[in-house]
From Swiss-Prot:
Subcellular location: Cell inner membrane
Enzyme Commission number, as recorded: 7.1.2.2
A molecular function GO annotation: ADP binding
Assembly mode: F-type ATPases have 2 components, CF(1) - the catalytic core - and CF(0) - the membrane proton channel. CF(1) has five subunits: alpha(3), beta(3), gamma(1), delta(1), epsilon(1). CF(0) has three main subunits: a(1), b(2) and c(9-12). The alpha and beta chains form an alternating ring which encloses part of the gamma chain. CF(1) is attached to CF(0) by a central stalk formed by the gamma and epsilon chains, while a peripheral stalk is formed by the delta and b chains.
Membrane topology per record: Peripheral membrane protein
Listed name of the protein: ATP synthase subunit alpha
Keywords tagged on the record: ATP synthesis, ATP-binding, Cell inner membrane, Cell membrane, CF(1), Hydrogen ion transport, Ion transport, Membrane, Nucleotide-binding, Translocase, Transport
Residues involved in ATP binding: G170, D171, R172, Q173, T174, G175, K176, T177
A cellular component term, taken from the record's GO annotations: proton-transporting ATP synthase complex
Reaction catalyzed: ATP + H2O + 4 H(+)(in) = ADP + phosphate + 5 H(+)(out)
Length: 511
């Protein structure tokens, strides 16, 4: 073999010249045990709480939650069956972050912000941390702008303002999700306008629901033309508990993008009971001590830090807002259970839906007595305040009297009148699903009820009366609605017009 010294020296010189002194140092650990979506990892001495870690062999990510003396408890965002004992785990030195921005509108994503709707990769997005601190006291402003749901019983009696947190609570199958979908659909006319300060973007977070249910919700939003200004974040029942735990924070980060950029958004968490169950599962598997109903001690903080991020910002911070509509499912109407009482104490009011009312045909099945909005009439336009003030009182008196009237045989005329008016107002507050009313139409319809124009109509004909009234108002009497919408109050000349129209309409109404 012929050795050429010149050639060898050339090779050595070129290798020395291209030698890179920087070593690629990665802090890694090893999986000790894995199961139920939790991995115990040895090593990772400097890992941060809440840091994203990687399982390179499985192509999965996880989050370090328990930092103990001899190991780290990691929750896995994905199928833990792909991870084996002894696998390498690497630090990423990043806290969990997700994509945010306008590019998400019209899309369905998972709890990590990955698109799952088959419409290709996301565009026009930036990334932000999932867990951020809620705005302090100084950047906030009192809630004063209405967030119209399009439901008469909510907008008149339990008004919601932009930046408020209003709980939707009730047993299964009482129409909680329908209230939220109606609210989203009701924003369509506003969002078709050009005034960015009035638009309201919608985010729906599905936690622990069936995939078929989520698909049905997306289909409804698409059919109603509401998907173009909505984002759906889905962590379904088949997803691991860590994904169900993370999804509400992911949705909230997406909503905060609009809030912090002088825009308005509403986010619905459907539902937080399932998030609490997922968090309980994770905590017990991480060997954290259980508390009441086996929930961990920090389950209140789990929800409070999420809901405190909904806020109305002051003018110096862009005057944007994020409104939260958390949903809680009760068991047999028990609102005094642990999670319901927690969330009731965090939120600014609740819409309480009852099974009994639902089966009586009163839908939306809102229990007006137990439901409350702690923001109140400051979240209503003047026109609604003018007509809604008396309906609250009349319904309260009706409920009180109806309880006693069961035992009394002969009632005086004033009591009979009160009961008749209350029964008609209850009928008037009924509304079919996915038919939200604009606020000016609600005002006109409620005006007819509280001013006594329904008193001569049989109770079972009130719904038909309202249907015809709405058709007439939207047709020949459109100028009345336009006046209420533009003035944002019922002026004396508008009231006179409305009264004369209603008098003629009641006279001509034949069953």
């Amino acid at each position: 073999m012929d050795i050429r010294p010149a050639e060898i020296s050339e090779i050595l010189k070129s290798q020395i010249a291209s030698f890179d002194s920087e070593a690629n140092v990665a802090e890694t650990g090893q999986v000790l045990s894995v199961g139920d979506g939790i991995a115990r990892v040895y090593g990772l001495q400097n890992v941060m709480a809440g840091e994203l870690v990687e399982f390179p062999s499985a192509g999965l990510k996880g989050m370090a939650l328990n930092l103990e003396n001899d190991n780290v408890g990691v929750v896995i965002f994905g199928d833990d069956r792909q991870i084996r004992e002894g696998d390498t785990v690497a630090r990423t030195r990043e806290i969990v972050d997700v994509p945010v921005g306008r590019g998400l509108l019209g899309r369905v994503v998972d709890a990590l912000g990955n698109p799952i709707d088959g419409k290709g990769p996301l565009t026009d997005v930036t990334r932000t941390r999932v867990e951020v601190k809620a705005p302090g006291i100084i950047p906030r402003k009192s809630v004063h702008e209405p967030m119209q749901t399009g439901l008469k019983s909510v907008d008149a009696l339990i008004p919601i303002g932009r930046g408020q947190r209003e709980l939707v609570i009730g047993d299964r199958q009482t129409g909680k999700t329908t209230v939220i979908l109606d609210t989203f659909i009701n924003q369509k006319p506003i969002n078709q306008g050009t005034d960015e300060s009035k638009k309201l973007y919608c985010i729906y977070v599905a936690v622990g629901q069936k995939r078929s249910t989520v698909a049905q919700i997306v289909r409804t939003l698409e059919e109603q033309g509401a998907m173009e200004y909505s984002i759906v974040v889905a962590a379904t029942a088949s997803d691991p508990a860590p994904m169900q735990f993370l999804a509400p924070y992911t949705g909230c980060a997406m909503g905060e993008f609009f809030r912090d950029n002088a825009m308005h958004a509403v986010i619905a968490y459907d539902d937080l009971s399932k998030q609490a169950v997922a968090y309980r599962q994770m905590s017990l598997l991480l060997r954290r001590p259980p508390g009441r109903e086996a929930y961990p001690g920090d389950v209140f903080y789990l929800h409070s830090r999420l809901l405190e991020r909904a806020a109305k910002m002051n003018d110096a911070h862009g005057a944007g807002s994020l409104t939260a509509l958390p949903v809680i499912e009760t068991q047999a109407g028990d609102v005094s259970a642990y999670i319901p009482t927690n969330v009731i104490s965090i939120t600014d009011g609740q819409i309480f839906l009852e099974t009994e009312l639902f089966f009586k045909g009163i839908r939306p099945a809102v229990n007006v007595g137990l439901s409350v909005s702690r923001v109140g009439s400051s979240a209503q336009i003047k026109a609604m305040k003018q007509v809604a003030g008396s309906i609250k009182l009349e319904l309260a008196q009706y409920r009180e009297m109806a309880a006693f009237a069961q035992f009394a045989s002969d009632l005086d005329a004033s009591t009979q009148k009160l009961l008749a008016r209350g029964a008609r107002l209850t009928e008037l507050l009924k509304q079919p699903q996915f038919t939200p009313y604009p606020v000016e139409l609600q005002v006109a319809v409620i005006f007819a009820g509280v001013k006594g124009y329904l008193d001569a109509i049989p109770t079972d004909k009130v719904v038909e009366f309202e249907r015809r009234l709405v058709a007439e108002l939207r047709g020949a009497q459109k100028d009345i609605l336009d006046a209420i919408r533009n003035d944002r109050e019922v002026k004396s000349e508008t009231e006179a017009k409305l009264r004369s129209f209603l008098e003629g309409f009641v006279k001509n109404f034949t069953v």
